[in-house]
C-alpha cells in the first residue's frame, strides 16, 4: 500500500550549494530535502543551471514537425510490432481512446559495443532517433540535455539525498554512473488540447475526479520533472488527494519506489496522479536509475538494530519487475 503523505506542501529549495564546497551550506540544503521528502514527498529545485526555455522550444518544434508516419515508424513494440524496442521510441496516441503521446530515449552511452548491449540484457537499447534532415540538431540536443539532467540528478542524489539520509556525499557514487545508468528521459510527453475531447480518454478516480493518468508510484530512484505551468498533479495525503503547485522555472523532484525500498520508506515514493485538464502542455520527466548490476544494502536512518529491513536486490531486476507492475496497473503509457 502507498504511504499517505502528511501534507501537500512543496517547498522551493536552492540547490546551488550542492555544486560547491561549503559543508554547512550543503547540510542546510540536506535538511530541507529531508523535510520535503517526509512531508509531501515533493520539492522544487531552483538554481539548477539548465536552460528550460530552450528545452521547451525544442520539444514544441519536435511535436510540430513529426508526421504520423514518423511516429509509427519509431513507435515501440506495443504500438508497432515490427519494432523490438520496448523503452526507446515513440509512444503513440490512439484516436478516441488515448490522447497523450511521448518520445522516450535512453542512455546515449548504450552503443553497439556496450557490454550490456552485446549481452542482450533486458532494459538496455541503442537509441533510434528521428531523421536528422527532417529534425536537424534534435539528436545532439537530446544527448546533451540527457547528460546535463543526469549530472543534475546525480548531484541531487549524491550530495543532497545522501546527506539528507545521514550518509556521506559519495554514498551513491559507484552505483550511479554515466556509462551504465539505466536512466531514461521521456523527453516529450505531450498532452493536447482537443475540441471535442474524447470521453474514452478520460479516466475517473475512486473519488470521482476526472483523470488523464491514474494514481501511481514512480519506478525510479528519483524523478526530476519539468513541466509547463498548467496545474495537473495531485498527491495522496492523510487528508485525501491534494493539488501540487506549478513552476515555470524549476524542476519538481520526488523519490521513486527504489529510494523508498532502499530506505525502508523513510523517504517513501509519494502516490500521485494527473488530473484531466484540456490544455496543451508538456511533461518532461527524467527517471534516474542505477546500473543493471548495482546492489545496495537497504537501511533506515533511525534503525537501532531491531527493525526488519528489506533484502538487497539487483537494480536491473528490481526495475524490470517494477515496470511490469506499473504497466499491469496503469496500462501502457
Swiss-Prot record:
Similarity section: Belongs to the iron/ascorbate-dependent oxidoreductase family.
Limits of the Fe2OG dioxygenase domain: 180-290
GO molecular function terms attached to this record: iron ion binding; isopenicillin-N synthase activity; L-ascorbic acid binding
PROSITE patterns tied to this protein: FE2OG_OXY (PS51471), IPNS_1 (PS00185), IPNS_2 (PS00186)
Record key words, sorted: Antibiotic biosynthesis, Iron, Metal-binding, Oxidoreductase, Vitamin C
Enzyme class: oxidoreductase
Binding-site residues, isopenicillin N: 87, 91, 191, 283
One of the GO biological process terms: antibiotic biosynthetic process
Catalytic activity: N-[(5S)-5-amino-5-carboxypentanoyl]-L-cysteinyl-D-valine + O2 = isopenicillin N + 2 H2O
Cofactor: Fe cation; L-ascorbate
Residues at which N-[(5S)-5-amino-5-carboxypentanoyl]-L-cysteinyl-D-valine binds: 87, 91, 191, 216, 218, 283
EC number of this enzyme: 1.21.3.1
Binding site for 2-oxoglutarate: 281
Binding site for Fe(2+): 216, 218, 272
Function according to Swiss-Prot or TrEMBL: Removes, in the presence of oxygen, 4 hydrogen atoms from delta-L-(alpha-aminoadipyl)-L-cysteinyl-D-valine (ACV) to form the azetidinone and thiazolidine rings of isopenicillin.
Organism: Streptomyces microflavus
Pathway it works in: Antibiotic biosynthesis; penicillin G biosynthesis; penicillin G from L-alpha-aminoadipate and L-cysteine and L-valine: step 2/3
Keyword Hydrolase recorded: no
PANTHER family associated with the record: 2-OXOGLUTARATE (2OG) AND FE(II)-DEPENDENT OXYGENASE SUPERFAMILY PROTEIN-RELATED
Protein name: Isopenicillin N synthase
Amino acid at each position: 500500500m502507498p504511504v499517505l503523505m502528511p501534507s501537500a506542501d512543496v517547498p522551493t529549495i536552492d540547490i546551488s550549494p550542492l555544486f560547491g564546497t561549503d559543508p554547512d551550506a550543503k547540510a542546510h540544503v540536506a535538511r530541507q530535502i529531508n523535510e520535503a521528502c517526509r512531508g509531501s514527498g515533493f520539492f522544487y529545485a531552483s538554481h539548477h543551471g539548465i536552460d528550460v526555455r530552450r528545452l521547451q522550444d525544442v520539444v514544441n518544434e519536435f511535436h510540430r514537425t513529426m508526421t504520423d508516419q514518423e511516429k509509427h515508424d519509431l513507435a515501440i513494440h506495443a504500438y508497432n510490432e515490427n519494432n523490438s524496442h520496448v523503452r526507446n521510441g515513440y509512444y503513440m496516441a490512439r484516436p478516441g481512446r488515448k490522447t497523450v503521446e511521448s518520445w522516450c530515449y535512453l542512455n546515449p552511452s548504450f552503443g553497439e559495443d556496450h557490454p550490456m548491449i552485446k549481452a542482450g540484457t533486458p532494459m538496455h537499447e541503442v537509441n533510434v532517433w528521428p531523421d536528422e534532415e527532417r529534425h536537424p540538431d534534435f539528436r545532439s540536443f537530446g544527448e546533451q540535455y540527457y547528460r546535463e539532467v543526469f549530472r543534475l540528478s546525480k548531484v541531487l542524489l549524491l550530495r543532497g539525498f545522501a546527506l539528507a539520509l545521514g550518509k556521506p556525499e559519495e554514498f551513491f557514487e559507484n552505483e550511479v554512473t554515466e556509462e551504465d545508468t539505466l536512466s531514461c528521459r521521456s523527453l516529450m510527453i505531450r498532452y493536447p488540447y482537443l475540441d471535442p475531447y474524447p470521453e474514452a480518454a478520460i479516466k475517473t478516480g475512486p473519488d470521482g475526479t476526472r483523470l488523464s493518468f491514474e494514481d501511481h508510484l514512480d519506478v525510479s530512484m528519483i524523478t526530476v520533472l519539468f513541466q509547463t505551468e498548467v496545474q495537473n498533479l495531485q498527491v495522496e495525503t492523510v487528508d485525501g488527494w491534494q493539488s501540487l503547485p506549478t513552476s515555470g522555472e524549476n524542476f519538481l523532484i520526488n523519490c521513486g519506489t527504489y529510494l523508498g525500498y532502499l530506505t525502508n520508506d523513510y523517504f517513501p515514493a509519494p502516490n500521485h496522479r494527473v488530473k484531466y485538464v484540456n490544455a496543451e502542455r508538456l511533461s518532461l520527466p527524467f527517471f534516474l536509475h542505477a546500473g543493471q548490476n548495482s546492489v545496495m544494502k537497504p537501511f533506515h536512518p533511525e534503525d537501532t538494530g531491531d527493525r526488519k529491513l528489506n533484502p538487497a536486490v539487483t537494480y536491473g531486476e528490481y526495475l524490470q519487475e517494477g515496470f511490469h507492475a506499473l504497466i499491469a496497473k496503469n496500462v501502457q503509457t
